[in-house]
Amino acid sequence: GINLMSEPLKATRFGYPCDRIPTSFELYFKYKPGTYAHTGDVFETREGTPDFCAIYAVFFDNVKAKAENPLNIPTLDGSNVFTSSSIIAIANLHTCDNAEYRQWEQGTNGEWKFINIPFKGVDENVDYLTLVDPERLKKQEYSLTIVCCSSYYGDFFEGAIDSELTI
């Protein structure tokens, strides 16, 4: 099993089986970053350090994820949501090509913003759509996870306690 106290990132379960291939991640959001950031387990205050949000979606092969998972479950977790070899494509506000979108991760001035982030294959030299087996897709052997967090490093217990992300 997993020790939740010593391995909190592994306690999460990311991914919902799907039978379609995502090509973009769209949503409306507004974000107000907090003014103080907290770091690690000791919650040291770093005045003036701006927080920023995390908004991303990950499309992955859940059969491969299950084979890689020591608990034999077809999900990703906080320790491998960006690094698992089962990942096929990612749509990430933080790394998207649209500079205007990226600036909104630092705040939207109370305004609702619409984003449409294309998925990018992990291997940029290969069209990720060609990596998906249509028969396996029908059997929901691929999964999608969506993560939205008011602090980009919230999974590491770092961020501002007064940041607000509304989806």
Predicted segments with their positions:
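Extracellular-facing segments of soluble proteins and assemblies that are Gly/Ser/Thr-biased and enriched
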Residues: 1-67
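Terminal, low-complexity interaction segments
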Residues: 60-167
